[in-house]
């Protein structure tokens, strides 16, 4: 996946505004189950929010780890919520069009 440009990130952040977090990071932190949940959510939705219940001080680092493990990209971090994006591997099934 190509690196997102600033305007593309802004567009995706606006698309994510109305979304609710689909995955929450709890006391166990980043586990294989968490990575699997994020991966499945990205496959189904392409653009998701991940809420930090714990590890709030490490949210930037943890978001990067999750993005690397799921081959996605961190669109932004707002408060205790990270926005992740990964386009669908099949172009005809992509739900989100980015400029």
Report each predicted region and the residues it spans:
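Positively charged, polar, low-complexity stretches
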Residues: 1-99
